[in-house]
A protein has these predicted regions:
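N-terminal glycine-rich FAD/FM-binding segment characteristic of electron-transfer flavoproteins
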Residues: 1-172
Length: 172
């Protein structure tokens, strides 16, 4: 069962669960996997799985550098940045940012899909969102069928315009 695949069950009123320390006595012969290298935690920012808002990009972003405008918008919205499988396959973003059937399944209040065509596998990962805003230059993109709101146009113009309006709203 994938995390966030189903809504959380209501509590039974018994209060928080008790945490019990457990340290099994194992040696290397008990382990099916051996750790050959420890990598520093590369995850930064807000967790995709826990985010209330996710700003996600697809092939339409154009390049790794194209994610800069999405990161700027995400910063203003206290959002996580996600992406489609095509983006991780191209090496533009790490796999930890991938939303979809083979990535993270998300259920934010708002999912902003920028330049994402909307493959079935991607929709499987974001269909738990309460609202989906799709920004796409293709008026026939499959993601539009799943979107609550859509803006058809160039995301390199639309995303900065949204960011500018949000900044104006925060000025004293």
């Amino acid at each position: 069962m994938a995390p966030h695949a189903l809504p959380a069950a209501p509590g039974n009123g018994a209060g928080p669960a008790e945490v019990e320390a457990f340290a099994p006595a194992l040696d290397e012969s008990d382990l099916a996997v051996q750790v050959s290298e420890h990598l520093d935690d590369v995850a930064t920012g807000i967790s995709l799985a826990e985010a209330k808002v996710v700003v996600s990009g697809g092939r339409g972003v154009g390049s790794a550098d194209g994610f800069g405008i999405l990161e700027e918008l995400a910063g203003l919205l206290d959002a996580a940045v996600g992406c489609s499988r095509v983006v991780t396959s191209a090496g533009w973003r790490p796999h930890t940012d991938q939303v979809g059937q083979t990535g993270t399944k998300v259920s934010p209040d708002l999912y902003i899909a920028c330049g994402i065509s909307g493959a079935t596998q991607h929709i499987a990962g974001c269909k738990g969102a309460k609202k989906i805003l799709a920004i796409n230059s293709d008026a026939e993109a499959p993601i539009l069928a799943s979107a609550d709101y859509a803006v058809i146009g160039d995301l390199t113009e639309i995303v900065p315009a949204i960011t500018a309006e949000l900044r104006k709203g925060r000025e004293p």
